[in-house]
Amino acid sequence: KLDLYGKVKAAHSWTDGTNADETYARLGFRGETQINDQLTGYGQFESQFDASKAEGSQNGVKTRLAFAGLDYGHDVSFDYGRNYGIAYDVGAYTDTLSEFGGDSFEDADRFLTSRTSGVATLRTKNLFGAVDGLSLGAQYQGQDDSDKDPTKQHGNGYGFSLGYDNIADSGV
C-alpha cells in the first residue's frame, strides 16, 4: 500500500513593516507492506518546497519526515529516522497555534517537541495487549553537535509518553 499526499499553501503576511510571500508546497508519501501475518514494514517521507521566490532563486527543499519501521501485531512498533519527537504527542491533542504562538512546539530538531532527526521510537498500544486503551511510547535521540551554531546542537535525548484513550467510554 502506498499513499501519495500533498499540500499547497498560498500565504502572504504583513507584520511590523514586513511584507513577505510565504507560499510553499508539500509532497509526501507513506507506505506499508505486509511481511508476514504478524509483521508489517512501514515508512514515510515528506518534503517542503519554497514557492515564494522566482524560479532558480528558491531557498531549497526541506525534508520534514523520513523514517522507516516495523509494526508487530498492530500492538508494538519501532521506527528510526526523522520523525515527530515524543513530546509532540501532547501537541497532537491540543491546538499548538501554528501561525501565531505555539513557540514551544516550533523548535524543530531540539527538545523532541517537533520534527526531529535521528530518533528511535518504540510504541505500544494497549500496553503490549495487557490494558485496553493504554499506550506507551519511548524515544531516544543521539547527540548532534555537527552544526557550529549552538542553538542547533543537542545532547543525547530521551522522552516518554503515556496515554489512555478510553476514559469512561468517552473516546478521550
Predicted ranges, named:
Residues 157:
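Conserved adenosyl
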Residues 167-172:
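Outer-membrane beta-barrel pore domains
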